[in-house]
Amino acid sequence: MSNNITIFGVGKLGVCFALNLERVGYSVLGVDIHPKYVDSINTKTLKSSEDSVESMLTLANNFTATTDVDQGLEFSNILFVLVATPSLDNGKYDHSQIDRLANQLIKRGRQETTKDLIIGCTTMPGYCDDLQDRLERYNYNVSYNPEFIAQGTVIRDQLYPDIVLIGSRNEESANKIKGVYERLVENTPVYSIMSPISAEICKIALNCFITTKIAFTNMIGDLATKVGGEPQSILDAIGADQRVGSKCTNYGYGYGGPCFPRDNRALGVYAKEQDCSIHISDATDECNADHLQFMIDNFEGDEVIVEGVTYKPQSMMIEESQQLAYAVGLAKKGVKVTLIDKPEVLSEVKSIYGDLFTYRD
């Protein structure tokens, strides 16, 4: 198998994947549409909030970037795609960046050598099969290989996955992807190989299972709090049962961030389209919202300090942050709220909420 790998889209996730691949001996070419960003990679001046990215880039000898799609195609027959697929207002994922790349590939005609196009971003179930139908005549094998990572620990999460999920119609393609990970990872993950649509369902369903567990945890915690019980003692006992497990059973803030909420909604939307309502998807979102309101309603006092308003520690993202939503809810009911976080985070919050809070870094 070739030692060269091309990655289309070297943003927060893609650049980490590129650096991890380079570290284990691959030559990696990143293709991105932003010239200044590409320059920052090639000049090793990229600034990143992800742990180890800047130091790994400084040491990397075989990772470069370009804006040239043709160069990316010529460099390797293994093409990973890690562009953004943000959520649309209807709850589905926006595939426009993948579609834009696919149209560019189609314009370049049929490839002499079969190329593996590996979609690593989250897609709606059925999308990769549709993409395969569009690209098959141009000699592409489309596979699906999403990553289960968390913002702030992407480098480590890619090296120590619990599961490597591969969706492919082609056994040879699936084995190529597996081979990349066998060289990359530093643990012994489960390799789950299935059809693309199965993998697409699996990706969002796995995250939805976690959101449901978090919502259930907080629901029981709220109930215990209301009747004078001991929330965490109850939850620790529940988590001690091996059928449940102790992960995600700490009573506290609900789920938020760029992945869990949108995956939960997307699964519900997709199921309804198939006339297979997954009521638990809607119920989980409702429980998450109810828990936030419970926390706000049960706060007693005139002032509070909220330390850390990103959706999770070691992240710079405030997207659907329950910590921030809690602070907003308290401030709107007259509580004096002081926020403590990194200057960059506070600057973003202040640009949205102005003088609603007192800010302290």
Where on the chain are the PLM-derived regions?
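Structural/interface elements that position substrates and couple domains in central-metabolism enzymes
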Residues: S2-D361
